[in-house]
Amino acid sequence: ENTLPQKSELFVSLPDYCPTPDGMAIAPNGDLILACPNFADITQPACLMRITKDGAVSKWLDVPVLEETGWASPMGLAFNEEGDLFISDNQGWSGAEKAKNKGRVLRLKFENDQLKETITVASGMEHPNGIRIRNGKLYVTQSSLSQIKDPSGLLVSGVYCFDMNDRDIAVTNTSADQNLLTTVITKNPEVQYGLDGIVFNEAGDLFVGNFGDGAIHRIKMDAEGKVVSNDVWAQDTTQLRT
């Protein structure tokens, strides 16, 4: 196994209408789809970019906005086997009061590469971020769950699990949420920002990045999808930078 550092090089430069690149996913045809929430320039509508294997860049579509706020904030992306695209819409990232607890998980359905239908899988989320699909389930990180109080006073974040065909699940961002799979505490008081990236290995173990702690947690589940362990799998506190 090659453990040596690999050389990186610039693949593409993005146009001005994508000042904030974020989540990525490979489309069924092999193109790279890139979410651009565009927090760095809110005059630019949040969009999805299409990047071909040879580096051709184009705008695919503007992400459907939430009527109450007038914007979208796409971050994590994941395709299912049918080619539907699931998006974590992190409305609350802006800090605007009208966007508080207005995050969504969206399902975009397509016909001939054109957006046909937008389905709201879940709404009312505080800080939805990463998203992955496994065995018909959606796993979504929430980087902040401020309504769940730990005795330490430190930040709680978590992972939610939805059925891929769910619609209009009302999330409360509390421990009463039936879709809340597991939670973690971010122990670094200088960076109170929780779970972010998310991925499965072939064995079905779920790995999530705890941003503030610079740690990766491994979450193991039983055959019914219940969490049996949630432990820090990798961390080097000497590498933390604020």
Indicate where each model-derived feature is located.
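A short helix->beta-strand "capping" segment at the edge of beta-propeller domains
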Residues: 2-18
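Histidine/lysine/aspartate-rich catalytic loop segments that bind and position anionic ligands
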Residues: 142-189
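Beta-rich, blade/repeat-based domains predominating
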Residues: 16-31, 35-38, 44-45, 65-85, ...
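A short loop-to-beta-strand structural motif that recurs across blades of beta-propeller domains
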Residues: 45-49, 103-106, 158-160, 215-217
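C-terminal closing repeat unit and adjoining cap/tail of repeat-based domains
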Residues: 217-242
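Short loop/turn segments immediately following the C-termini of beta-strands
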Residues: 37-39, 90-92, 100, 143-146, ...
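Short loop/turn segments immediately following beta-strands, especially the blade-tip
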Residues: 108-113, 162-172, 219-226
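Beta-propeller fold detector
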Residues: 8-12, 58-64, 116-123, 170-186, ...
